[in-house]
Amino acid sequence: MPQFDLRGIQIAKYVNTNGVITYTDRQTAGDAMTANMELRYAEGRLYAESTLAEYMRKATGGSISLGVKYIPNAAQKIMFGSREKQRTVGQKQITGLVLGGKTTSAYVGVGMYAPDMIDGVEKFTAVKIAKALFGPPSMTLQTAGENIVFNTPTTTGEFLADDSTDQDMIEVAICDTEEDAIAWVTAALT
């Protein structure tokens, strides 16, 4: 499926209740720019009679990175465990976000969708990552020169099997309309 765009990245708090997985506090992760998900595998080979007799490959998790225009504060608090801190500057209260030695990231579910083309017909591929853990993005700042360079955040992390009996990692659905894809992502993160 050749995707040609990316839209609607959302995150939600991951909740495990005795193997029943639900999600709360669904939020946008920011205006979508890039998403990369790559599975990682455990592999095993058995040689017998001087030849490869058995081969096994099993998904164990993977890496994920999300690039967005900016990460909203509400999403940063859920994903990275950031906390708000207010400072008085003149007569104003300015609120910032703090990450520190006691800050702990939390597991989240991730959803998004991508318009694509299947046999000449536009469809929408919706994706859900069941359980992921992210770290705050690095900050790259530079002075303006002759050309304007936008530095946008990319957060990276790991995804792994959820705590259900099926141990889900990634779910993908092909939807006929953008409305269906949005509704699917919303339903997947509840």
Name every feature range the model reports, one short phrase each.
Residues 61-127:
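Structured, beta-strand-rich domain cores
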Residues 1-80, 131-149:
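Solvent-exposed edge beta-strands and adjacent loop segments
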Residues 13-14, 113-115, 175:
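Assembly/interface hotspot detector across virion components, adhesins/toxins, and nucleic-acid enzymes
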Residues 9-12, 32, 110, 181-185:
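Generic hydrophobic, helix-prone segments enriched in Leu/Val/Ile
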Residues 132-190:
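Mixed-charge, glycine-accented linear interaction segment located at domain edges/termini
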Residues 38, 43, 49, 54, ...:
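Glutamate identity and glutamate-enriched acidic tracts
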